[in-house]
Swiss-Prot record:
The gene is RBP4. Pfam families: Lipocalin. This is Retinol-binding protein 4. One of its GO terms (biological process) is retinol transport. InterPro entries: Calycin (IPR012674), Lipocalin_ApoD (IPR022271), Lipocalin_CS (IPR022272), Lipocln_cytosolic_FA-bd_dom (IPR000566), Retinol-bd/Purpurin (IPR002449). The modification Omega-N-methylarginine is found at residue 139.
């Protein structure tokens, strides 16, 4: 029976060593991030929501890089107002570079005034540029360095989603951000593809 207890002890030690470091400063981002390769259309497939009113589903983002290397983005998606009024709304973001090519300051605002605006950190946690991307932002940190108010998007180039292999990578990144099981699936049902012009703001 001693070997059984030894295995139990090893498992306990392994669990303790594997305890996740949830301080924001410990999170890894994409090495040698390339803005030009990242540009183009991305479909939001899952989202960890922050505080405030943001786009809720049917979210499509378009990233671009100008001749000076500055990145910007536009996004369209559905928002529900007053619990029963669905509208399509646009948001705009501009990015300021930092010393790390995968970490930006993002100034964003809604074309409609009811949407949130701010100037948040915007980190590209991981991407292969052709299939998936995981974005993260911490808007407010606790005293211990963990995040008190964060949001995160999982983006795809294909609105139909990922292969099982990519899903496994994405789940791992979500766990590394201490956000496992905190994302909700983003639907894409064509609500904002031009069929509902009367409800576009």
């Amino acid at each position: 029976m001693e070997w059984v207890w030894a295995l139990v002890l090893l498992a306990a030690l392994g669990s303790a060593q594997a305890e996740r470091d949830c301080r924001v400063s410990s999170f890894r981002v994409k090495e040698n991030f390339d803005k030009a390769r990242f540009s183009g259309t991305w479909y939001a497939m899952a989202k960890k929501d922050p505080e405030g009113l943001f786009l809720q589903d049917n979210i499509v983002a378009e990233f671009s890089v100008d001749e000076n290397g500055h990145m910007s983005a536009t996004a369209k998606g559905r928002v529900r107002l007053l619990n029963n009024w669905d509208v399509c709304a646009d948001m705009v973001g501009t990015f300021t570079d930092t010393e790390d090519p995968a970490k930006f300051k993002m100034k964003y605002w809604g074309v409609a005034s009811f949407l949130q605006k701010g100037n948040d950190d915007h980190w590209i946690i991981d991407t292969d540029y052709d299939t998936y991307a995981v974005q993260y932002s911490c808007r407010l940190q606790n005293l211990d360095g963990t995040c008190a108010d964060s949001y995160s998007f999982v983006f795809a180039r294909d609105p139909h989603g990922f292969s099982p292999e990519v899903q496994k990578i994405v789940r791992q990144r979500q766990e590394e951000l201490c956000l496992a099981r905190q994302y909700r699936i983003i639907t894409h049902n064509g609500y904002c593809d031009g069929k509902s012009e009367r409800n576009i703001l």
